[in-house]
Amino acid sequence: MKYPQLSLRETNAPYMEEMKTAAAEVIEGGWYIRGKYVSRLEEQLCAYLGCRYAVATGNGLDALRLMLRAYIEMGVMQPGDEVIVPSNTYVASVLAITDNGLVPVFVEPSIHTYNLDTSLVERAVTARTRAIMVVHLYLSLI
């Protein structure tokens, strides 16, 4: 069976010139950590999401680690709790879970979307399940 391949070139094509310009501005500005572009991104995220705070991180692993740590600090989760995650996930998802003392529960993806198969998720939920980490590796949200 052949599977369609994700073409990042096609996906990014409509935005390429804008991305090149933005990247050049950041490089020429010399601020890769914090700085006005990161502050602007955080402000725009707050406006878009309708929230008061947003924190840009260096990578997805850091973001996932902080999110799960916040849930633990708020008492929503505790070490030993389970987090359902797609079996075809990127390793950062699993590292964020295990680094926080949580237990990953792997669920197979749908053959049609490559995302979590919802019928299998229902069967994987236990009394220790506290979260489902939705990972859309192939730009498909459904």
Question: Language-model features: where?
Answer:
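Phosphate-binding glycine-rich loop
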Residues: 31, 36-82, 96-98, 106
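PLP-dependent aminotransferase-like
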Residues: 72-142
